[in-house]
Regions:
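Short basic helix-loop element that most often maps to the first helix and adjoining turn
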Residues: 5-20, 76-77
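Conserved hydrophobic/aromatic packing and binding residues within compact polymer-binding modules
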Residues: 7, 21-22, 32-35
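Short polybasic/polar patches that bind polyanions
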Residues: 12, 23, 55
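Short, conserved glycine- and acidic-residue-centered signature motifs
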Residues: 14, 43-46
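DNA major-groove recognition helix of helix-turn-helix/homeodomain DNA-binding modules
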Residues: 26, 45-62
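Recognition helix of helix-turn-helix/homeodomain-like DNA-binding domains
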Residues: 26-42
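Helix-turn-helix/homeodomain-like alpha-helical modules used for DNA recognition
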Residues: 59-79
Length: 79
């Protein structure tokens, strides 16, 4: 599952604001803000949309052998 830390790191790598991510994922700005602040986890559809748009932009989510989130990697530059 995407974590708030991974979302912030991915946005930083892509040089996207929270507004950029919200618009690209077609979710509300408050959804992104609240998620990244750790206030709540978005509903599955919204979390999937955020993850999908980050992966489409070339971000890979990294997990350790136990499945614990470990960070991100950029697989390509954003087009």
């Amino acid at each position: 599952m995407l974590t708030p830390e991974q979302s912030r790191a991915a946005r930083g790598w892509l040089n996207w604001s929270q507004e950029d991510l919200a618009q690209r994922a077609n979710v509300s700005l408050s959804t992104v803000r609240n998620f990244e602040k750790g206030r709540n986890v978005p509903i599955k559809n919204n979390l999937d949309a955020i993850r999908s748009v980050l992966e489409s932009a070339g971000i890979s989510l990294l997990f350790d052998n136990g499945g614990k989130p470990h960070g991100i990697a950029a697989t390509s530059q954003e087009p």
